[in-house]
Amino acid sequence: MSGELLYYRSGDGLIATGHIDGNGLFSHLADGRLSDGWTRIVPVGRELLFYRDDNGVIATGRLGRDGIYTNLADGKLSDGWDQIVPLGRELLFYRNDTGTIATGRLGTNGTYVNLADGTLSTGWTRIVPLGRELLFYRSDTGRIATGRLDTNGIYTNLADGTLGTGWTRIVPLGRELLFYRSDTGRIATGRLDTN
């Protein structure tokens, strides 16, 4: 794993950037300041989408290989999105309480374009991207669902099932998934096929 990193402190907007090389060595690159209060920062290619869930304000920017952050655009979306999941240049927005979803695309110029709106089941605690596919998980029931988001922002449900309850982290690694429980340290692995 190698690439640039952005560290953000929401209380005062301080940022620091760094780089991890192919050997895992970290190098500090730059320091700066952004607006405070961002609740979500989502990477989309080299661009970043900043989101405030209390008022829906967004900003987009680009992190250069030199660690310098450049602001690209500002805008506004609906407030209250609990999860924002990137899939290529597209984004899936999800509200846990209503199941409302919206999809959009972030251009390389930082412009956000809404693509589609819809509704899914409520209560998903984790939404994990794997290529164009998504794994939805409810930690209280173990319920899962999988689906696909196309480049036009259209979501298609693929399958439903169940896993164990209580997984607190689900990490994608290619087509494989690592499941982790913070209370017990238990792990499990799985694979999502393309069907």
Residue ranges: model-predicted function:
Residues 1-195:
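Trp/Gly-enriched beta-strand/coil motifs that build multi-repeat beta-propeller-like domains
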